[in-house]
Amino acid sequence: MSENLSSFKGFEARKAAWEVIQAVGGGAFADVALERTFNLYSFNSMDKALITELSYGAIRQRYFLDCWIDSLGKVSAKKQPPLLRWLLHLGLYQILKMERIPPSAAINTTVELAKTHHLKKLAPVVNGILRSALRSKEKGLLLSKSNNPSLELAKNESLPFWLADELIAWKGVEAANKIAQAFNSISPIDIRVNKLRANLKEVKEIFDSSGIQNQVIPNCPYGLEVRAGVGEPRKWPGYVEGLWSVQDRSSQLIAPSLGPLPGEKILDACAAPGGKSTH
């Protein structure tokens, strides 16, 4: 069985996601690590979407997943070999956070990655922790609770404890939970139309005709919201031609709010790379 698993659908994508998680664990920026992986290997759009979801999801839920390792393993997460810790994150994220992936696929491919990538002796540990997590999920058993609401929020929503504590002090437990859940939600992609080359209506029509789901962003005269998970933005129509660029809606509001006038000199002291500067 072991020699055939590497040909299973999604195996190479999971391997690539693991590499991204490892890179970020070593200090790399997530988007840079992901881009490097896409440049190294040839993946179709579906595999790229899976890699993105697995890597970003596991990174986003790092503390939550560490808590599960602490709960189920004999060795705490931070004392695990980094390679094993990140692999467990990959498997646990699929089991605990991705309903569309069959648990058997998540467990088998993660164990196979351990066997074939320098963790063969620890493969039984991987198998045991993942199967324990699955049993706990099926029985409705969650992480052990404490009487500290800040700790509970930090564990369940994968936040630094200090941030959970500040949110509760600021907004109360209920509102803090909603804010934390928003932190972990998958955001749509916002784009800003280059008014020197196109207008909002033209770009919207181009996206509509290409099957890219989008909608106008309220109060952003040149902004469109695109549903996440529809492929690489650089391959969307109009990108190469410079009709639009990716820019968050909050950033799109900066230049109009400033109200620059012809002839004025304005210093953007935080430009990197300068999306707002070119607005």
PLM region descriptions:
Residues M1-R234:
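Class I Rossmann-like S-adenosyl-L-methionine
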Residues K201-H279:
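Rossmann-like S-adenosyl-L-methionine
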